[in-house]
Amino acid sequence: MGTSGIEIFAALNDFTDAIVSVPESVCGKFTSLKEIDAQVRDIRQNVIQEIGVVLKNEKNDELSGEERCERLQKTLKEILPYSDSKICLATDAMNNIKSCIDRLDAGFEYVELEIPQQLRLGYPDDRALMNYHSTVTPQTSERRRETRRHQNNQHSQQYSSQERSSSYNNFEDASSPQSSYHTPTKRRKNAVPRKSSSPPLSSTKHAPQSTERRPVRRSESRLKQTNGEPLVKHDTLDSSDISREGEQLYCYCQQVSYGQMIGCDNENCKREWFHLPCVGLVEPPKGIWYCKECEELAKSSESRQ
């Protein structure tokens, strides 16, 4: 027998029932409040009439002024029970809404665990995200390309053949997290897989650690193996790629590093790192991966050739 939707999404159904129960729990209270208001309006009209008679103070009135005041006071006292009833009804309605909110808060975590992230967040609007490309000035792009070329030149001078051999041996033993970062030429030549469905914390470019605020770059990691100092300096980064807190911005969404991210294999990629939900991925793919901009650029270059 197949499993019904109620059994699959039990937490979601309970969450929906809590939302549906909000109008039912307060509708009766509000109806009673309207009925009390109607009764109070009738008494209010009687009070206004009594006040008018007292102010006129007619001599031929059947009741004296004191009797009229006592009668007015008695009428006013009739309103007090209605006021107490309205306070009780409003308090009950507030408590019912509060209990529904507490129920929603308690079940929200289970709903997130029950529904996959891809189904909850959906796929991003690629065209909307691509609008950022039009806001980047040619001068900014040229500065970034110049910075990348400078970094690659420094890296090629510092990374000797002996260090490449040592890094490759350490990568096979999986004993050192620093040995997992190689140049693209070295990785493809030795047929070392660049990505996997469940990569180690520091063994792949496509899975930076979620605890770090900024993904590790290839050139930066490799320089740490040689002299312990990062190659990329903060003063070489463009101001448009820095957040207000001074952190590097990545991806189409122009946010800081968080969660699981994937890196583009194009050395001249403008954004470098991308959040998996922003590119429509659930887990890092195997093999070489390019962002849509770099992929379209490569296709246009091939068509020209």
From Swiss-Prot:
Region named Disordered: 135-239
Residues modified as Phosphoserine: S197, S198
Gene3D superfamilies: 6.10.140.1740, Zinc/RING finger domain, C3HC4 (zinc finger)
Main localization of the protein described in the UniProt heading: cytoplasm
Site description Histone H3K4me3 binding, residues in chain: Y250, M261, D265, W273
Biased composition annotated in UniProt, kind: Low complexity: 153-167
Subcellular location: Cytoplasm; Nucleus
UniProt entry keywords in alphabetical sequence: Chromatin regulator, Cytoplasm, Metal-binding, Nucleus, Phosphoprotein, Repressor, Transcription, Transcription regulation, Zinc, Zinc-finger
Listed GO MF terms: methylated histone binding; zinc ion binding
Binding site residues for Zn(2+) 1: C251, C253, H275, C278
Gene Ontology cellular component annotations, sorted alphabetically: cytosol; NuA4 histone acetyltransferase complex; nucleus; Rpd3L complex; Rpd3L-Expanded complex
Biased composition (Basic and acidic residues): 211-223
Domain notes: The PHD-type zinc finger mediates the binding to H3K4me3.
The protein's name: Chromatin modification-related protein png2
